[in-house]
């Protein structure tokens, strides 16, 4: 079989270049990988892990007057982005399209129309049917819902709009699931499961029998929800309830939940590792989607 080769790729809101990880794992070759990102810690991590990523800065600067920062419109094979989701999500203070952060979606749409990539992927959270309908009309495709639980022990439902054919949510093959546990210390689990109190079921844990974590988001990494309540996903009673011990997942454990290589984010502070991972793709989900690109050579 011929290996898939792409000309140029543009990753908007690139974060820590999770898309680049997926391309590498799939053995997809490319000539240029352009990344638009403004968060310094994310850029630092991307550069530490990959020296072939071309960082082109703010999405607002990728314009015709700036010659699209070197991107040739007729040579772009893949456009990928997941703009900040809080403005769309019903958990995002009901701001929806009025949220300034949602304006980044329209930058994605602008570049989709101006650069005319062969393939595109747009990712976002589950949201109200009305907003889904509006986005679908703008992008010209219906979304596919994929839960990261297909590939790692967390519940992280996301919508993916793409023109890549034959992408669907499906049952994973055995080798899709990471073989090793996400946990550095398994000793916490049995005691935690035994001593969970009634009414505390929202503090889900990944246990050896396959139960799953709730979705990982940045607010959960901070340990609080948007309204100030304790976060669900990363504040876990991995110790003894009787003494009130609460431990967060380690950055390494979070990397494994997001199917990012071990220690990929070790070049920044623990807080910034949590933030970067919480805002990033689950890499194996992106692998699943990219794996459907037809090889037309």
Predicted features, each with a name:
Residues 1-297:
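Conserved active-site and SAM-binding loop architecture
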């Amino acid at each position: 079989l011929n290996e898939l080769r792409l000309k140029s790729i543009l990753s908007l809101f690139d974060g820590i270049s999770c898309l680049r990880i997926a391309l590498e794992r799939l053995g997809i070759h490319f000539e240029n990988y352009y990344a638009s990102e403004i968060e310094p810690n994310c850029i630092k991590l991307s550069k530490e892990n990959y020296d072939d990523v071309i960082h082109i800065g703010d999405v607002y600067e990728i314009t015709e007057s700036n010659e699209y920062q070197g991107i040739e419109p007729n040579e772009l094979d893949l456009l990928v982005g997941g703009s900040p989701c809080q403005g769309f999500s019903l958990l995002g203070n009901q701001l929806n399209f009025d949220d300034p952060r949602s304006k980044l979606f329209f930058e994605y749409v602008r570049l989709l129309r101006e650069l005319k990539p062969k393939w595109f992927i747009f990712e976002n959270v589950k949201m109200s049917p009305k907003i889904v309908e509006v986005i679908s009309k703008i992008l010209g495709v219906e979304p596919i819902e994929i839960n990261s639980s297909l590939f790692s022990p967390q519940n992280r439902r996301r919508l993916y709009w793409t023109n890549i054919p034959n992408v669907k949510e499906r049952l994973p093959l055995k080798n899709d699931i990471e073989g090793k546990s996400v946990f550095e210390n398994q000793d916490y689990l049995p005691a935690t499961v035994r001593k969970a109190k009634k009414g505390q079921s929202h503090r889900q844990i990944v246990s050896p029998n396959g139960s799953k974590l709730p979705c990982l988001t940045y607010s959960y990494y901070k340990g609080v929800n948007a309204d100030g309540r304790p976060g669900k996903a990363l504040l876990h009673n991995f110790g003894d309830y009787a003494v009130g011990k609460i431990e967060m997942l380690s950055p390494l454990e979070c990397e494994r939940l997001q199917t990012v290589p071990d220690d990929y984010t070790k070049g920044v502070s623990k807080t910034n590792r949590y933030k970067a991972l919480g805002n990033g793709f689950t890499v194996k989900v992106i692998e699943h989607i990219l794996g459907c690109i037809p090889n037309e050579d």
